């Protein structure tokens, strides 16, 4: 029996840290295999998937800027870290027989295509996974903002923000055991309650473009598929 798909085209935001697993930094082999396996499952269901990946497992521009490094330089280094993660994801997809393409917002023609919206949309329509690397290509913008931007440009049905927590809570569940998860919440409610769904620029862009967000825990087996089929998984932030 074919399962009903709630979202046909999605933009998945993966943090670099989500690829570390239990390691202190870098890419954990078992973790990336599990993550890519979860994504491959929805690709085989016919879902078109674009991915924006962070680079915090390799280099965090904001942290470096707290020292003596110039912020723009640190951000460019962070962008290059996202390219490394994107290439690792592409390789993992192709190992599973899933066609994937890396498009970089910075020109790196020897290792990745330069971002081009029409080509990216074509790839999605062909069933290929498109991995968007190097953020927006500009310093001072987070990969959350890059995800919101690419999600809007690709005309995605939803933005899926994969985190280490299985949704948006009334308080930090690690600090407050009485915290409860929101099943759904509006953009305005999230703002009024000062819930940190993502950075303000990304949140504002999603709200303006009416691009709903689902926050969910990627490490929870089957969670991505449950989001796609409309089950109670994570938190839906909507207009």
Curated annotation (Swiss-Prot):
Task: Give the record's pathway.
Answer: Pyrimidine metabolism; CTP biosynthesis via de novo pathway; UDP from UMP (UMPK route): step 1/1
Protein keywords: ATP-binding, Cytoplasm, Kinase, Nucleotide-binding, Pyrimidine biosynthesis, Transferase
Q: What is this protein called?
A: Uridylate kinase
EC code(s) of this entry: 2.7.4.22
Q: How is its activity regulated?
A: Inhibited by UTP.
Q: Quote the catalytic activity from the record.
A: UMP + ATP = UDP + ADP
Task performed by this protein: Catalyzes the reversible phosphorylation of UMP to UDP.
Q: Which amino acid positions bind ATP, per UniProt?
A: 13-16, 56, 60, 163-164, 169, 172
Q: Which domain of life is it from?
A: Bacteria
Question: HAMAP family, from UniProt?
Answer: PyrH_B
Summarize the subunit comment: Homohexamer.
